[in-house]
Amino acid sequence: MATNEVPVIDLAAFEQGDHAIRAEISQRTDEACQLTGFIAITHHGVDQHIIDNMWNTMQEFFDLPTSVKQKFNVPFPGYPYGYMGNEAETLAASRGSTTPPDLKETFNGGPISIPSHISDPEALAFCYASTPWPSQPETFVQAWTSYYNAMENLASRIMRLFAEALSLNTHYFDEYISSPISALRALNYPPQQFAPQPGQLRAGAHSDYGSLTILLPQHDSRGLEIQSLDGSWQEVDPVPGAFIINLGDLMERWTNNRWRSTMHRVVNPELAHDPLSRRQSIAYFHQPNWDASISTIPTCIDSSAPAHYEPVLSGPYLMSKFRSTI
């Protein structure tokens, strides 16, 4: 299995740089988003205490007995937030594939607050549905909220980098993400004490749905793979001190297929690398405002690349994608 070296982008250097530096980093970002749709963001400015507190709290939560975690289950199939136990989701289904369910457990939460202007019943019932917050460990809500807010801020900064990478005004995306309907997911891939079913993975091959994903993989963890243009799979190793960023289907659509929403998966541990080891990660799925109309970006249209897509509304688009996996 080949290892893919994800392009590393220094966010602080971009934000603090002069015109030439910003242009150079923007160009490298554009090239990476066209080639793989994956980059690693370093010097991101997220407080390490917030990261450590989130890691520790999520590990404590997943270490609880299953009977305790199930008290915070999603209330019914198709509900977006809460605890989902092992084999409760099949990500490959979102791409039309039929596989056994994924070997992972998750906790999912949505926006921390509901904007005053939101009145759409579908939005309130889906993206702004209440999260069944765990009472154990006691630090859960505080750790989760701090991390979510940090990711929302980081996503806004990355979207400004993306704007310049697409030859747009720095603040082009701001109006689309003023009240994002982003979700946060903590993932635990338990030790594998029994052989998986044929075709069963820790996370089946899929692409993400929104504008971008901010992934924090466990230090020195293995198993994340991305699909190359030739169809082969390449392993992606964590970059110390960095967040892994990948593009979602909505961004591919927004950019008229200029940028890639890359298929990725989490494979099972090899026998030679301790199948009993767990793997954990934290993923923030950034999604524009519920009612944002996503039309092809002007700089991604020319005589050789006419617009391929009709406009879609961000929220209903996300809702249809999510419900295909349940």
Predicted regions and their residues:
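Peripheral, non-catalytic segments flanking oxidoreductase cores
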Residues: 1-326
